[in-house]
From Swiss-Prot:
Membrane-traversing stretches: 34-54, 78-99, 114-134, 179-199, 227-247, 289-309, 321-341, 348-368
Keyword Electron transport: yes
Gene it is expressed from: mt-cyb
Note: Heme 1 (or BL or b562) is low-potential and absorbs at about 562 nm, and heme 2 (or BH or b566) is high-potential and absorbs at about 566 nm.
PROSITE patterns listed in its UniProt record: CYTB_CTER, CYTB_NTER
Protein name, as recorded: Cytochrome b
Function: Component of the ubiquinol-cytochrome c reductase complex (complex III or cytochrome b-c1 complex) that is part of the mitochondrial respiratory chain. The b-c1 complex mediates electron transfer from ubiquinol to cytochrome c. Contributes to the generation of a proton gradient across the mitochondrial membrane that is then used for ATP synthesis.
Recorded topology in the membrane: Multi-pass membrane protein
Organism: Sphyrna tiburo vespertina (Pacific bonnethead shark)
Cell location: Mitochondrion inner membrane
Main location: mitochondrion
Signal peptide coordinates: none
One Gene Ontology biological process: mitochondrial electron transport, ubiquinol to cytochrome c
InterPro entries: Cyt_b/b6_C (IPR005798), Cyt_b/b6_C_sf (IPR036150), Cyt_b/b6_N (IPR005797), Cytb/b6-like_sf (IPR027387), Cytochrome_b (IPR030689), Cytochrome_b_C_euk/bac (IPR048260), Cytochrome_b_N_euk/bac (IPR048259), Di-haem_cyt_TM (IPR016174)
Pfam families: Cytochrom_B_C, Cytochrome_B
Length: 381
């Protein structure tokens, strides 16, 4: 009887088609685990964030103290806060690995799914940015000041736009209050878009490592991949709890233990590690507007990837030339992340500029050209 309810009940039927009887390619590897891991990350972040919001006060005179209160006086508040802060880092690790898998195996050819994914990345970055401002430490305040100030680069409307976002003439109480509102609201928008992301994915079915049609060889999602995902859940929770319990401040900035002071500028203003690659690209261009446009394009360039696909094969698995350039792109992104955390001086300036040019060249010119060359080599045989 339970089987029939699962397949006939209007609500359970949707869940059944998405999680139980979903036809999945039999050869999808460990790299396909990250979608479900991102779902788990989102649930963890929403739940821990909800408990933090119960004790947090969005006021410049009390924000820092309320975070201290959470860590000292609230039952397991220190744990909730550490899981939330490090959960964000793990979220971005999973996102970047998920995107890398999509680029390597050609999953971007599901254009609707891919483009919604890019919008999700942008929303995730916005959520993380406004969330980083909430503890109201030195790096929170100055990070908010520097990054929001970039909008002043836009001609004519720039200054008005910045003051509109600030809610005044500087980052102050109005800014903190609205950033808290955005930080509370955006995860639910991410949740809604995730459902649409899955909806489009289930219209086409999952890609597979070979990048070929797998309709002839599908197996049900449960029990095969549900248990495989469960293993991933346990591994990720192990890493998250290890990080939160033993090294909670490893990925944070020491400056944020100092309450925000508008009169004292930190020696080196930098965002969290997951934004450093984009921050390095921003800093590598001497022009302010050019830097802002490059920063935005460093993320939205992912939307051009399906249009720049010139290969006759979908996956990179049998394309050694493109594989080399893919791993060069990965190495280049790691170099950009490192450069973003360094002071603005030689040789870091030059390395950052070379890495930024390489980043865009690999996406726009080198990888499409490598694919075209591979097509020519294949046609010779």
């Amino acid at each position: 009887m339970a089987i029939f309810i699962r397949k006939t009940h209007p609500l359970l039927k949707i869940m059944n088609h998405a999680l139980v009887d979903l036809p999945a390619p039999s050869n999808i590897s460990l790299w396909w685990n990250f979608g479900s891991l991102l779902g788990l990350c989102l649930i963890i972040q929403i739940l821990t964030g909800l408990f933090l919001a119960m004790h947090y006060t969005a006021d410049v005179s009390m924000a820092f103290s309320s975070v201290v209160h959470i860590c000292r006086d609230v039952n397991y508040g220190w744990l909730i806060r550490n899981i939330h802060a490090n959960g964000a880092s793990l979220f971005f690790i999973c996102v970047y690995l998920h995107i890398a898998r999509g680029l390597y195996y050609g999953s971007y050819l599901y254009k609707e799914t891919w483009n919604i994914g890019v919008i999700l990345l942008f929303l995730l970055m916005a959520t993380a940015f406004v969330g980083y401002v909430l503890p109201w430490g030195q790096m929170s305040f100055w990070g908010a000041t520097v990054i929001t100030n970039l909008l002043s680069a836009f001609p004519y409307i720039g200054n008005t736009l910045v003051q509109w976002i600030w809610g005044g003439f500087s980052v102050d109480n109005a800014t903190l209050t609205r950033f808290f509102a955005f930080h509370f609201l955006l995860p639910f928008l991410i949740l809604a878009l995730t459902i649409i992301h899955l909806l489009f994915l289930h219209e086409t079915g999952s890609n597979n490592p070979l990048g070929i049609n797998s309709d002839a060889d599908k197996i049900s999602f449960h029990p095969y991949f549900s248990y495989k995902d469960l293993l991933g859940f346990f591994v990720m929770i192990f890493f998250l709890t290890t990080l939160a319990l033993f090294m909670p401040n490893l990925l944070g900035d020491a400056e944020n233990f100092i309450p925000a002071n508008p009169l004292v500028t930190p020696p080196h203003i930098k965002p969290e590690w997951y934004f450093l690659f984009a921050y390095a690209i921003l800093r590598s261009i001497p022009n302010k507007l050019g830097g802002v446009l490059a920063l935005l394009f460093s993320i939205f360039i992912l939307m051009l990837v399906p249009l720049l696909h010139t290969s006759k094969q979908r996956s990179n698995i049998f394309r050694p030339l493109t594989q080399i350039f893919f791993w060069l792109l990965v190495a280049n992104s790691i170099i950009l992340t490192w450069i973003g955390g360094q002071p603005v001086e030689q040789p870091f300036i030059t390395v950052g500029q070379v890495a930024s040019i390489s980043y865009f060249s690999l996406f726009l010119i080198i990888m499409p050209f490598a694919s075209w060359c591979e097509n020519k080599i294949l046609s010779l045989n």
